[in-house]
Amino acid sequence: MTRPVLVMMRPLPLPLLRANGEEIEVRQFQGDFSLFEGATVLCSTALDRVDADFIAAIPDSVKLIANMGTGYDNIDLVAATEKGIKITNTPVVAEDTADLAFLLILASARQLTANQKFLRAGHWTSTQPATHIGKTAHGTTLGIVGFGQIGQAVARRAKGFNMNVIYHGPRRKPAAEKLLDATYFETLEEMLATADIVSLNCALTAQTKHIINAQTLSAMKSDAVLVNTGRGALIDEAALVDAMNAGHLSAAGLDVFEYEPDIHPGLLELDNVTLAPHIGAATAQCHEAIGACAIENILAQFEGRELISCVDP
């Protein structure tokens, strides 16, 4: 029996893996495509670009790309599908990402970054009122763009803050609406004009790239808060910087960036923007769940079982 071979795009701690009683050989990719000889599975992360050229360079023996993360916009799905390669993801990050989204909602609304900077600089020298006054989050209208697992998890948290939840997406979700007392808006602009706080939780596609741009930003309330824990390229960052410098929007909270780890310098200069280095899934428990999900898909491929989280092409 041929020994099963797994190629890793980056070094990740894995337990000893066996498929059908055979130990899986794990190879670390470092630019040499000859390492793929005899390989059946490639394991990648959201930080690894698996484009059409990369897919063309790997042998036909590769039948699965097991991507670690919910998003898979780093992979050329068309090229993979045409080559007969299946894609799996790890959709186990919803609750942790929703936690971070709500952290950014509260931190941004209450101007935490500006107030922390004020304190750390030693300017808090008396019982004077806070220099940077925030806005109330509870009881406001929260607009969610993308009402999948993560968007709905954000909505569940919002109900605890007595928020009015509205959402926009490519299709209505009546069951989720009823469960979460949420209202669907067919047009993005109408939802943006209604929301006090906007949370981006949709996937990055050709249709959603720069879904927040100069035009849609102008549709938002002038004192609105914008939060993004989806993908950085959902926002035209230059347009966001221009809008905030013009006093449009009271605050923003961003965990993801279009060209991360590079960040638009204008964002770094704004005290009313709370920034995080893509930590939506950065908890020990979530990392463990991601690894377990990826491993289960990898073993399923080697053992001829059904994949647990196969992505539709």
Give the ranges of each region predicted by the language model.
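Glycine-rich NAD(P)-binding loop of Rossmann-like domains
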Residues: Q116-A153
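N-terminal glycine-/charge-rich "phosphate-binding" loop or analogous flexible N-terminal tail
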Residues: M1-T45, F302
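Rossmann-like adenosine-cofactor binding region
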Residues: V50-A52, R172-G266
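C-terminal helix-to-coil terminal segments
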Residues: L16, N89-L100, T127-I133, E260-P313
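Phosphate/diphosphate ligand-binding glycine-rich loop within oxidoreductases
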Residues: T40-R120, G134
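NAD(P)-binding Rossmann-fold cofactor-contacting core
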Residues: G160-K178
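A short helix->loop->beta-strand "cap" motif at the edges of active sites that frequently abuts
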Residues: I58-L64, K83-I85, M163, S222-A224, ...
